[in-house]
Amino acid sequence: MIMKMNLYCILCLFLTVFSSACGNEKIDGNKTKQVTLTITPSDEIIVEGKGGSVSFTVTPSDPTVALKYVPSVEWVKATSGTKETLWNIATNTSKLSREGYIYILDNASLVQLGKITIIQKSTDGEIQENPTVSFNEADVPIFIPFAGNSYMTTPPASSEIDLYTGKFKDTWMDKTIVSSTYFHVGETGNMNLAVVGSNETGNSIVRFKIRDKTYDVTISGPTSKIYGIATIPIKKSGYIRVDMQGVSRSGKSFGDVTGFRIGGQATMGDNHFVTEEKMVEDKLNCYFFRRGASVHWGYTMPEANVEYFYNEVLVTEENVRNSSYYMMNGFSEGYMGIQQTSSGEHTILFSVWSPYSTDNPSDIPEDKRVKLLRKGKNVTVGEFGNEGSGGQSWLHCGWKAGTVYKALVQVKPDGNGNTIYTAYFYADNEWKLIASFLRPDTNTWYKGAHSFLENFDPVNSIYTRSVLYRNQWVRLASGDWKEITTAKFTCDNTGIQGLRYDYSGSVDEKNCGFVLKSFGFSDDHTEYGKIFTRPSSGTAPDIDFKRLENIPSVE
Protein backbone atom coordinates (compact mmCIF):
# COMPACT_ATOMS: atom_id res chain seq x y z
CA MET A 1 0.00 0.00 0.00
CA ILE A 2 1.14 3.56 -0.65
CA MET A 3 1.64 4.90 2.85
CA LYS A 4 1.62 8.68 2.52
CA MET A 5 2.11 10.77 5.64
CA ASN A 6 -1.21 12.25 6.76
CA LEU A 7 -1.57 15.44 8.78
CA TYR A 8 -1.47 13.60 12.10
CA CYS A 9 1.76 11.84 11.19
CA ILE A 10 3.30 15.09 10.05
CA LEU A 11 2.44 16.71 13.37
CA CYS A 12 3.80 13.70 15.24
CA LEU A 13 7.05 13.98 13.32
CA PHE A 14 7.29 17.72 13.97
CA LEU A 15 9.93 17.23 16.62
CA THR A 16 12.22 15.13 14.45
CA VAL A 17 11.89 16.79 11.06
CA PHE A 18 13.31 20.19 11.93
CA SER A 19 17.04 20.69 12.14
CA SER A 20 18.66 19.68 15.41
CA ALA A 21 20.91 22.73 15.28
CA CYS A 22 20.54 25.05 18.27
CA GLY A 23 18.61 27.74 16.52
CA ASN A 24 15.55 28.57 14.43
CA GLU A 25 13.54 31.51 13.21
CA LYS A 26 10.93 33.26 15.35
CA ILE A 27 8.23 35.09 13.44
CA ASP A 28 6.74 38.15 15.15
CA GLY A 29 4.30 40.08 12.98
CA ASN A 30 6.20 41.09 9.87
CA LYS A 31 9.58 40.55 11.51
CA THR A 32 11.56 37.35 11.20
CA LYS A 33 14.67 36.77 13.27
CA GLN A 34 16.94 33.88 14.20
CA VAL A 35 16.65 32.43 17.71
CA THR A 36 19.77 30.64 18.90
CA LEU A 37 20.36 28.73 22.12
CA THR A 38 23.34 28.66 24.41
CA ILE A 39 23.44 25.31 26.25
CA THR A 40 25.80 24.70 29.15
CA PRO A 41 27.70 22.67 30.03
CA SER A 42 27.01 20.88 26.68
CA ASP A 43 24.25 19.75 24.36
CA GLU A 44 25.54 16.16 24.78
CA ILE A 45 25.59 14.59 28.23
CA ILE A 46 27.09 11.18 29.07
CA VAL A 47 25.52 9.39 32.04
CA GLU A 48 26.71 6.33 33.97
CA GLY A 49 24.67 3.14 33.69
CA LYS A 50 23.37 3.49 37.27
CA GLY A 51 21.59 6.70 36.24
CA GLY A 52 21.08 9.79 38.36
CA SER A 53 20.35 13.48 37.90
CA VAL A 54 21.59 15.74 35.12
CA SER A 55 21.17 19.48 34.79
CA PHE A 56 21.88 22.08 32.18
CA THR A 57 21.25 25.73 31.45
CA VAL A 58 19.60 26.94 28.27
CA THR A 59 19.65 30.62 27.33
CA PRO A 60 17.81 31.81 24.19
CA SER A 61 19.21 34.73 22.21
CA ASP A 62 15.77 36.34 22.47
CA PRO A 63 14.89 36.61 26.19
CA THR A 64 11.19 36.95 25.35
CA VAL A 65 11.07 33.37 24.04
CA ALA A 66 9.59 30.90 26.53
CA LEU A 67 10.98 27.38 26.23
CA LYS A 68 9.32 23.97 26.45
CA TYR A 69 11.20 20.70 27.04
CA VAL A 70 9.99 17.34 25.67
CA PRO A 71 11.84 14.03 26.35
CA SER A 72 11.94 11.43 23.57
CA VAL A 73 12.23 8.42 25.91
CA GLU A 74 10.60 7.14 29.09
CA TRP A 75 13.89 6.71 30.96
CA VAL A 76 14.53 10.48 30.92
CA LYS A 77 12.09 12.36 33.17
CA ALA A 78 11.88 15.86 34.60
CA THR A 79 12.50 15.95 38.37
CA SER A 80 9.24 16.83 40.09
CA GLY A 81 9.04 20.23 41.78
CA THR A 82 12.25 21.60 40.25
CA LYS A 83 13.27 23.53 37.21
CA GLU A 84 12.69 21.93 33.80
CA THR A 85 16.47 21.79 33.35
CA LEU A 86 16.95 19.20 36.11
CA TRP A 87 16.25 15.66 34.93
CA ASN A 88 16.41 12.15 36.34
CA ILE A 89 17.96 9.33 34.30
CA ALA A 90 16.75 5.80 35.14
CA THR A 91 19.16 2.88 35.61
CA ASN A 92 20.21 1.11 32.41
CA THR A 93 19.93 -2.64 33.03
CA SER A 94 21.13 -3.58 29.53
CA LYS A 95 24.57 -4.61 28.34
CA LEU A 96 24.08 -2.06 25.57
CA SER A 97 24.43 1.69 25.90
CA ARG A 98 21.46 3.80 24.88
CA GLU A 99 20.67 7.25 23.56
CA GLY A 100 17.74 9.61 24.05
CA TYR A 101 16.90 13.26 23.53
CA ILE A 102 15.34 16.23 25.29
CA TYR A 103 13.83 18.44 22.61
CA ILE A 104 13.81 22.20 23.23
CA LEU A 105 10.81 23.97 21.68
CA ASP A 106 9.46 27.48 21.39
CA ASN A 107 6.56 27.21 23.85
CA ALA A 108 4.30 29.38 21.69
CA SER A 109 4.90 27.94 18.22
CA LEU A 110 6.24 24.48 19.20
CA VAL A 111 9.03 24.98 16.67
CA GLN A 112 12.10 22.95 17.62
CA LEU A 113 15.00 25.22 18.57
CA GLY A 114 17.47 22.54 19.66
CA LYS A 115 17.95 19.34 21.64
CA ILE A 116 20.03 17.77 24.40
CA THR A 117 21.47 14.33 23.60
CA ILE A 118 21.64 11.92 26.55
CA ILE A 119 24.03 8.96 26.11
CA GLN A 120 23.86 6.41 28.92
CA LYS A 121 26.50 3.74 29.41
CA SER A 122 25.71 0.03 29.60
CA THR A 123 25.83 -2.09 32.77
CA ASP A 124 29.47 -2.76 31.88
CA GLY A 125 30.21 0.96 31.75
CA GLU A 126 30.70 0.97 27.98
CA ILE A 127 29.37 3.00 25.09
CA GLN A 128 28.94 1.02 21.87
CA GLU A 129 29.87 2.50 18.51
CA ASN A 130 26.17 2.44 17.65
CA PRO A 131 24.49 3.04 21.01
CA THR A 132 20.88 2.02 21.47
CA VAL A 133 18.62 4.93 20.62
CA SER A 134 15.13 5.44 21.96
CA PHE A 135 12.09 6.64 20.08
CA ASN A 136 8.52 7.26 21.08
CA GLU A 137 5.59 6.70 18.75
CA ALA A 138 5.76 10.28 17.50
CA ASP A 139 9.30 9.67 16.28
CA VAL A 140 8.30 6.50 14.39
CA PRO A 141 4.58 6.79 13.49
CA ILE A 142 4.52 4.29 10.59
CA PHE A 143 4.16 0.59 11.48
CA ILE A 144 5.53 -2.07 9.11
CA PRO A 145 4.35 -5.59 10.02
CA PHE A 146 6.91 -8.39 10.16
CA ALA A 147 4.29 -10.66 8.59
CA GLY A 148 3.85 -9.98 4.90
CA ASN A 149 7.14 -8.12 4.50
CA SER A 150 9.69 -10.61 5.83
CA TYR A 151 11.57 -13.53 4.26
CA MET A 152 14.21 -16.05 5.27
CA THR A 153 17.56 -15.09 3.73
CA THR A 154 19.85 -17.36 5.81
CA PRO A 155 19.39 -20.11 4.93
CA PRO A 156 17.74 -18.77 1.76
CA ALA A 157 14.29 -19.97 0.72
CA SER A 158 13.92 -21.93 3.95
CA SER A 159 10.63 -22.72 5.67
CA GLU A 160 10.95 -21.05 9.11
CA ILE A 161 8.37 -18.42 8.10
CA ASP A 162 4.85 -19.71 7.55
CA LEU A 163 3.60 -19.25 3.97
CA TYR A 164 0.14 -18.11 5.03
CA THR A 165 0.67 -16.14 8.27
CA GLY A 166 4.04 -14.63 7.37
CA LYS A 167 5.23 -15.24 10.95
CA PHE A 168 7.78 -17.64 12.42
CA LYS A 169 6.26 -21.13 12.47
CA ASP A 170 7.82 -22.06 15.79
CA THR A 171 9.43 -20.40 18.78
CA TRP A 172 12.36 -18.30 17.61
CA MET A 173 15.34 -20.08 19.18
CA ASP A 174 17.89 -20.57 16.39
CA LYS A 175 20.59 -17.90 16.29
CA THR A 176 21.97 -19.10 12.95
CA ILE A 177 18.93 -18.02 10.93
CA VAL A 178 18.47 -14.54 9.47
CA SER A 179 15.16 -13.02 8.43
CA SER A 180 15.00 -9.93 6.23
CA THR A 181 12.23 -7.35 6.17
CA TYR A 182 11.81 -5.11 3.13
CA PHE A 183 10.00 -1.80 2.68
CA HIS A 184 10.20 1.09 0.21
CA VAL A 185 10.63 4.72 1.29
CA GLY A 186 9.81 7.52 -1.10
CA GLU A 187 12.06 10.36 0.07
CA THR A 188 15.62 11.08 1.17
CA GLY A 189 16.87 12.37 4.52
CA ASN A 190 17.09 10.80 7.95
CA MET A 191 14.97 7.75 8.77
CA ASN A 192 14.24 6.73 12.36
CA LEU A 193 13.99 2.95 12.67
CA ALA A 194 12.63 0.99 15.62
CA VAL A 195 11.53 -2.58 16.27
CA VAL A 196 8.34 -3.55 18.08
CA GLY A 197 8.63 -6.66 20.22
CA SER A 198 8.44 -8.46 23.54
CA ASN A 199 10.05 -11.42 25.28
CA GLU A 200 8.00 -13.17 27.92
CA THR A 201 10.75 -15.76 28.54
CA GLY A 202 13.46 -13.30 29.62
CA ASN A 203 15.96 -10.99 27.95
CA SER A 204 17.52 -11.30 24.51
CA ILE A 205 19.95 -9.39 22.35
CA VAL A 206 18.85 -9.16 18.73
CA ARG A 207 21.13 -7.89 15.98
CA PHE A 208 19.81 -5.78 13.11
CA LYS A 209 21.79 -5.06 9.96
CA ILE A 210 20.97 -2.17 7.63
CA ARG A 211 23.25 -1.35 4.71
CA ASP A 212 26.34 -3.07 6.18
CA LYS A 213 25.97 -1.53 9.66
CA THR A 214 24.86 -3.61 12.63
CA TYR A 215 22.89 -2.55 15.70
CA ASP A 216 22.28 -4.69 18.80
CA VAL A 217 19.02 -4.21 20.70
CA THR A 218 17.95 -5.77 24.01
CA ILE A 219 14.34 -7.02 24.03
CA SER A 220 12.82 -7.94 27.38
CA GLY A 221 9.53 -8.34 29.19
CA PRO A 222 6.10 -9.66 28.20
CA THR A 223 4.73 -6.25 27.16
CA SER A 224 5.26 -5.20 23.56
CA LYS A 225 7.39 -2.06 23.37
CA ILE A 226 9.11 0.18 20.85
CA TYR A 227 12.87 -0.37 20.84
CA GLY A 228 14.96 2.14 18.93
CA ILE A 229 17.47 0.79 16.42
CA ALA A 230 19.04 3.82 14.74
CA THR A 231 18.60 7.02 12.79
CA ILE A 232 19.81 6.20 9.31
CA PRO A 233 20.63 8.71 6.55
CA ILE A 234 18.81 7.78 3.33
CA LYS A 235 20.53 9.25 0.28
CA LYS A 236 18.30 7.62 -2.34
CA SER A 237 14.65 6.67 -2.20
CA GLY A 238 13.97 2.98 -2.67
CA TYR A 239 13.88 -0.34 -0.87
CA ILE A 240 15.38 -0.77 2.60
CA ARG A 241 16.39 -4.23 3.83
CA VAL A 242 16.54 -4.90 7.58
CA ASP A 243 18.22 -8.18 8.56
CA MET A 244 17.36 -9.65 11.97
CA GLN A 245 19.34 -12.32 13.85
CA GLY A 246 19.30 -13.53 17.43
CA VAL A 247 22.58 -13.08 19.34
CA SER A 248 21.93 -14.27 22.90
CA ARG A 249 18.98 -15.04 25.18
CA SER A 250 18.39 -15.74 28.84
CA GLY A 251 15.15 -17.62 28.23
CA LYS A 252 13.66 -20.02 25.74
CA SER A 253 13.14 -17.50 22.94
CA PHE A 254 14.68 -14.48 21.28
CA GLY A 255 11.24 -12.91 21.59
CA ASP A 256 8.26 -12.00 19.48
CA VAL A 257 8.90 -9.26 16.93
CA THR A 258 5.64 -8.03 15.43
CA GLY A 259 7.17 -5.44 13.15
CA PHE A 260 9.12 -2.25 12.71
CA ARG A 261 8.30 1.44 13.00
CA ILE A 262 9.76 4.21 10.87
CA GLY A 263 9.68 7.99 10.85
CA GLY A 264 11.67 11.01 9.79
CA GLN A 265 12.11 12.99 6.60
CA ALA A 266 12.81 9.92 4.43
CA THR A 267 9.38 8.46 5.27
CA MET A 268 7.32 11.53 4.37
CA GLY A 269 6.69 10.55 0.74
CA ASP A 270 5.03 7.48 -0.79
CA ASN A 271 6.08 4.40 1.16
CA HIS A 272 5.32 0.87 -0.03
CA PHE A 273 4.90 -2.32 2.00
CA VAL A 274 2.23 -4.86 3.00
CA THR A 275 0.00 -3.35 5.67
CA GLU A 276 -1.91 -5.03 8.49
CA GLU A 277 -5.18 -3.72 7.08
CA LYS A 278 -4.65 -5.51 3.77
CA MET A 279 -3.64 -8.81 5.35
CA VAL A 280 -6.76 -9.06 7.51
CA GLU A 281 -9.08 -8.53 4.54
CA ASP A 282 -8.57 -12.17 3.49
CA LYS A 283 -6.67 -15.02 5.15
CA LEU A 284 -4.89 -15.79 1.87
CA ASN A 285 -3.72 -12.22 1.29
CA CYS A 286 -0.42 -12.63 3.13
CA TYR A 287 0.45 -15.64 0.95
CA PHE A 288 -0.26 -13.86 -2.33
CA PHE A 289 1.26 -10.52 -1.32
CA ARG A 290 4.52 -12.23 -0.30
CA ARG A 291 4.73 -13.79 -3.77
CA GLY A 292 5.30 -10.32 -5.22
CA ALA A 293 3.61 -8.59 -8.14
CA SER A 294 3.01 -10.52 -11.35
CA VAL A 295 3.60 -8.30 -14.39
CA HIS A 296 2.07 -8.45 -17.87
CA TRP A 297 2.26 -7.29 -21.45
CA GLY A 298 -1.10 -6.80 -23.15
CA TYR A 299 -0.47 -6.80 -26.90
CA THR A 300 -2.33 -4.51 -29.31
CA MET A 301 -4.12 -6.78 -31.79
CA PRO A 302 -5.42 -5.93 -35.28
CA GLU A 303 -9.13 -5.38 -35.93
CA ALA A 304 -9.58 -8.73 -37.66
CA ASN A 305 -10.12 -12.41 -36.87
CA VAL A 306 -6.81 -13.67 -35.47
CA GLU A 307 -6.20 -17.43 -35.64
CA TYR A 308 -2.59 -17.78 -34.46
CA PHE A 309 -0.36 -15.88 -32.04
CA TYR A 310 3.41 -16.36 -32.34
CA ASN A 311 5.94 -15.31 -29.69
CA GLU A 312 9.58 -15.94 -28.73
CA VAL A 313 11.10 -16.03 -25.25
CA LEU A 314 14.59 -15.74 -23.78
CA VAL A 315 15.43 -16.36 -20.11
CA THR A 316 19.09 -15.84 -19.24
CA GLU A 317 20.92 -17.89 -16.60
CA GLU A 318 20.72 -15.28 -13.84
CA ASN A 319 16.94 -15.05 -14.26
CA VAL A 320 16.19 -18.76 -13.91
CA ARG A 321 14.63 -19.41 -10.51
CA ASN A 322 12.36 -22.03 -9.00
CA SER A 323 8.63 -21.25 -8.92
CA SER A 324 8.74 -19.07 -12.04
CA TYR A 325 6.27 -18.95 -14.93
CA TYR A 326 7.47 -17.10 -18.02
CA MET A 327 4.10 -17.15 -19.77
CA MET A 328 4.41 -16.51 -23.51
CA ASN A 329 1.10 -16.91 -25.35
CA GLY A 330 -1.86 -15.90 -23.24
CA PHE A 331 -5.40 -15.65 -24.56
CA SER A 332 -8.77 -14.79 -23.03
CA GLU A 333 -9.49 -18.41 -22.06
CA GLY A 334 -6.04 -19.66 -21.02
CA TYR A 335 -2.29 -19.48 -21.50
CA MET A 336 0.89 -21.24 -22.59
CA GLY A 337 4.52 -20.71 -21.61
CA ILE A 338 7.68 -22.07 -20.01
CA GLN A 339 7.99 -22.85 -16.31
CA GLN A 340 10.56 -23.74 -13.71
CA THR A 341 8.67 -25.60 -11.00
CA SER A 342 9.26 -25.41 -7.25
CA SER A 343 11.42 -28.53 -7.56
CA GLY A 344 13.47 -27.09 -10.43
CA GLU A 345 11.92 -29.05 -13.32
CA HIS A 346 11.69 -27.26 -16.68
CA THR A 347 8.33 -27.75 -18.40
CA ILE A 348 6.07 -26.08 -20.95
CA LEU A 349 2.57 -25.49 -19.62
CA PHE A 350 -0.59 -25.10 -21.72
CA SER A 351 -3.97 -24.58 -20.03
CA VAL A 352 -7.53 -23.84 -21.16
CA TRP A 353 -10.24 -22.82 -18.68
CA SER A 354 -13.69 -24.36 -18.67
CA PRO A 355 -16.65 -22.05 -19.42
CA TYR A 356 -18.13 -23.30 -16.12
CA SER A 357 -16.96 -21.06 -13.28
CA THR A 358 -15.55 -23.05 -10.34
CA ASP A 359 -12.26 -23.65 -8.53
CA ASN A 360 -13.02 -27.37 -8.18
CA PRO A 361 -12.64 -29.39 -11.43
CA SER A 362 -14.91 -32.18 -10.13
CA ASP A 363 -17.84 -29.72 -10.00
CA ILE A 364 -17.81 -29.13 -13.76
CA PRO A 365 -20.77 -30.75 -15.59
CA GLU A 366 -19.76 -33.17 -18.32
CA ASP A 367 -21.06 -30.94 -21.13
CA LYS A 368 -18.98 -28.01 -19.82
CA ARG A 369 -15.68 -29.84 -19.57
CA VAL A 370 -12.66 -28.99 -21.69
CA LYS A 371 -11.96 -32.08 -23.83
CA LEU A 372 -8.59 -33.31 -25.08
CA LEU A 373 -8.46 -33.83 -28.86
CA ARG A 374 -4.71 -34.44 -29.42
CA LYS A 375 -1.54 -34.50 -27.37
CA GLY A 376 2.12 -34.64 -28.29
CA LYS A 377 5.02 -36.84 -27.28
CA ASN A 378 6.31 -36.45 -23.69
CA VAL A 379 3.16 -34.55 -22.72
CA THR A 380 1.15 -35.09 -19.53
CA VAL A 381 -2.52 -34.04 -19.51
CA GLY A 382 -4.68 -33.35 -16.48
CA GLU A 383 -7.06 -30.92 -14.82
CA PHE A 384 -6.40 -27.86 -12.70
CA GLY A 385 -8.27 -25.80 -10.10
CA ASN A 386 -7.98 -22.97 -7.57
CA GLU A 387 -7.84 -20.27 -10.28
CA GLY A 388 -10.82 -21.38 -12.28
CA SER A 389 -10.78 -24.94 -13.64
CA GLY A 390 -10.14 -26.62 -16.93
CA GLY A 391 -7.77 -28.73 -19.00
CA GLN A 392 -4.02 -28.59 -18.52
CA SER A 393 -1.00 -30.11 -20.26
CA TRP A 394 2.76 -30.20 -19.67
CA LEU A 395 5.47 -30.84 -22.23
CA HIS A 396 8.58 -32.24 -20.54
CA CYS A 397 11.42 -31.03 -22.75
CA GLY A 398 13.99 -29.49 -20.39
CA TRP A 399 14.26 -25.99 -21.87
CA LYS A 400 17.61 -24.30 -21.25
CA ALA A 401 18.60 -20.85 -20.02
CA GLY A 402 20.10 -18.59 -22.67
CA THR A 403 18.23 -20.26 -25.54
CA VAL A 404 15.52 -18.53 -27.59
CA TYR A 405 12.34 -20.60 -27.79
CA LYS A 406 9.31 -20.13 -30.05
CA ALA A 407 5.65 -20.74 -29.28
CA LEU A 408 2.54 -20.82 -31.45
CA VAL A 409 -1.06 -21.06 -30.23
CA GLN A 410 -4.09 -21.48 -32.48
CA VAL A 411 -7.61 -20.46 -31.45
CA LYS A 412 -10.34 -21.35 -33.96
CA PRO A 413 -14.13 -21.90 -33.79
CA ASP A 414 -15.23 -25.35 -34.92
CA GLY A 415 -18.52 -24.13 -36.42
CA ASN A 416 -20.61 -26.06 -33.87
CA GLY A 417 -20.57 -23.59 -30.98
CA ASN A 418 -17.20 -24.74 -29.64
CA THR A 419 -13.63 -23.49 -30.02
CA ILE A 420 -10.44 -25.52 -30.48
CA TYR A 421 -7.19 -24.40 -28.83
CA THR A 422 -3.89 -25.92 -30.00
CA ALA A 423 -0.37 -25.17 -28.75
CA TYR A 424 3.02 -25.86 -30.37
CA PHE A 425 6.54 -25.34 -29.03
CA TYR A 426 9.72 -25.09 -31.09
CA ALA A 427 12.73 -26.85 -29.56
CA ASP A 428 15.54 -29.10 -30.83
CA ASN A 429 15.05 -27.69 -34.36
CA GLU A 430 11.45 -28.84 -34.72
CA TRP A 431 7.90 -27.86 -33.83
CA LYS A 432 6.40 -30.07 -31.12
CA LEU A 433 2.70 -30.52 -30.45
CA ILE A 434 1.75 -29.92 -26.85
CA ALA A 435 -2.02 -30.45 -26.96
CA SER A 436 -5.28 -29.56 -28.63
CA PHE A 437 -8.36 -28.91 -26.47
CA LEU A 438 -12.02 -28.32 -27.32
CA ARG A 439 -13.79 -25.73 -25.15
CA PRO A 440 -17.59 -26.09 -25.28
CA ASP A 441 -20.08 -23.20 -25.49
CA THR A 442 -17.41 -20.94 -26.97
CA ASN A 443 -17.29 -19.26 -30.37
CA THR A 444 -14.21 -17.09 -30.63
CA TRP A 445 -10.96 -16.40 -32.44
CA TYR A 446 -7.71 -15.50 -30.67
CA LYS A 447 -8.39 -12.57 -28.33
CA GLY A 448 -6.63 -10.97 -25.38
CA ALA A 449 -3.06 -11.79 -26.44
CA HIS A 450 -0.74 -11.27 -23.48
CA SER A 451 2.40 -12.48 -21.70
CA PHE A 452 3.25 -12.42 -18.01
CA LEU A 453 5.98 -13.13 -15.46
CA GLU A 454 4.87 -14.84 -12.24
CA ASN A 455 6.49 -16.13 -9.05
CA PHE A 456 4.23 -18.78 -7.48
CA ASP A 457 6.07 -19.49 -4.21
CA PRO A 458 6.49 -16.72 -1.58
CA VAL A 459 9.93 -17.92 -0.42
CA ASN A 460 11.40 -17.15 -3.85
CA SER A 461 10.05 -13.60 -3.98
CA ILE A 462 13.44 -12.28 -2.79
CA TYR A 463 15.01 -13.12 -6.17
CA THR A 464 14.74 -10.72 -9.10
CA ARG A 465 13.67 -12.17 -12.44
CA SER A 466 13.35 -10.69 -15.90
CA VAL A 467 12.33 -12.19 -19.22
CA LEU A 468 12.51 -11.08 -22.85
CA TYR A 469 9.52 -11.63 -25.16
CA ARG A 470 10.37 -10.80 -28.76
CA ASN A 471 9.21 -10.83 -32.39
CA GLN A 472 5.46 -11.11 -31.80
CA TRP A 473 3.28 -11.87 -34.83
CA VAL A 474 -0.33 -12.90 -35.47
CA ARG A 475 -1.70 -14.84 -38.41
CA LEU A 476 -5.19 -13.82 -39.42
CA ALA A 477 -7.95 -16.23 -40.42
CA SER A 478 -7.35 -14.94 -43.96
CA GLY A 479 -3.79 -16.31 -43.85
CA ASP A 480 -2.04 -12.94 -43.65
CA TRP A 481 0.72 -12.28 -41.10
CA LYS A 482 0.67 -9.06 -39.03
CA GLU A 483 3.52 -7.94 -36.77
CA ILE A 484 2.66 -6.84 -33.20
CA THR A 485 4.87 -4.00 -32.01
CA THR A 486 2.81 -2.28 -29.28
CA ALA A 487 2.02 -3.52 -25.78
CA LYS A 488 0.63 -2.13 -22.52
CA PHE A 489 2.40 -2.79 -19.21
CA THR A 490 0.20 -3.90 -16.28
CA CYS A 491 0.55 -5.73 -12.98
CA ASP A 492 -1.63 -7.68 -10.57
CA ASN A 493 -3.44 -6.40 -7.48
CA THR A 494 -0.32 -6.61 -5.29
CA GLY A 495 1.30 -4.01 -7.50
CA ILE A 496 -1.84 -1.97 -8.14
CA GLN A 497 -2.32 -1.45 -4.39
CA GLY A 498 1.30 -0.40 -3.97
CA LEU A 499 2.13 -3.27 -1.63
CA ARG A 500 5.11 -4.08 -3.84
CA TYR A 501 6.96 -1.53 -5.96
CA ASP A 502 9.75 -3.67 -7.46
CA TYR A 503 8.45 -4.24 -10.98
CA SER A 504 9.04 -2.74 -14.41
CA GLY A 505 8.66 -3.07 -18.15
CA SER A 506 10.99 -1.92 -20.93
CA VAL A 507 11.87 -2.39 -24.59
CA ASP A 508 14.94 -4.26 -25.85
CA GLU A 509 15.48 -2.46 -29.15
CA LYS A 510 18.35 -4.68 -30.29
CA ASN A 511 16.23 -7.82 -29.97
CA CYS A 512 12.91 -6.25 -31.07
CA GLY A 513 11.31 -7.31 -27.83
CA PHE A 514 9.55 -6.41 -24.60
CA VAL A 515 11.15 -7.06 -21.20
CA LEU A 516 9.30 -7.81 -17.96
CA LYS A 517 11.05 -7.58 -14.58
CA SER A 518 9.77 -8.17 -11.06
CA PHE A 519 10.58 -9.46 -7.55
CA GLY A 520 13.81 -9.16 -5.59
CA PHE A 521 13.04 -5.70 -4.16
CA SER A 522 14.88 -3.82 -6.89
CA ASP A 523 14.23 -0.10 -7.30
CA ASP A 524 13.13 -0.44 -10.93
CA HIS A 525 9.51 0.63 -11.32
CA THR A 526 7.13 1.29 -14.23
CA GLU A 527 3.80 3.04 -14.02
CA TYR A 528 0.75 0.81 -14.50
CA GLY A 529 -0.77 1.12 -17.97
CA LYS A 530 2.25 2.59 -19.76
CA ILE A 531 2.33 1.89 -23.50
CA PHE A 532 5.53 0.63 -25.14
CA THR A 533 6.45 0.19 -28.81
CA ARG A 534 9.28 -2.06 -29.96
CA PRO A 535 11.21 -1.87 -33.25
CA SER A 536 9.85 -3.97 -36.10
CA SER A 537 11.79 -7.04 -37.19
CA GLY A 538 9.97 -7.08 -40.52
CA THR A 539 10.37 -10.83 -40.97
CA ALA A 540 7.31 -13.02 -40.49
CA PRO A 541 7.71 -16.55 -39.09
CA ASP A 542 8.29 -19.30 -41.66
CA ILE A 543 5.97 -22.10 -40.56
CA ASP A 544 4.61 -25.13 -42.44
CA PHE A 545 1.07 -25.25 -41.04
CA LYS A 546 0.17 -28.45 -42.89
CA ARG A 547 3.03 -30.20 -41.14
CA LEU A 548 1.81 -28.93 -37.76
CA GLU A 549 -1.68 -30.28 -38.42
CA ASN A 550 -0.21 -33.68 -39.31
CA ILE A 551 1.83 -34.15 -36.13
CA PRO A 552 0.39 -37.42 -34.80
CA SER A 553 -1.35 -37.56 -31.46
CA VAL A 554 0.25 -39.79 -28.83
CA GLU A 555 -1.98 -41.93 -26.64
What is each residue range found by the language model?
Residues 107-114, 251-254:
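Short, exposed coil/turn segments at beta-strand boundaries within extracellular/luminal domains
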Residues 77, 123-398, 406-413, 417-555:
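Extracytoplasmic
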Residues 97-108:
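A short beta-strand micro-motif common to beta-rich folds, especially ectodomain repeats
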Residues 90-97, 233-236:
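Surface-exposed, short loops/turns at beta-strand junctions within beta-sandwich domains
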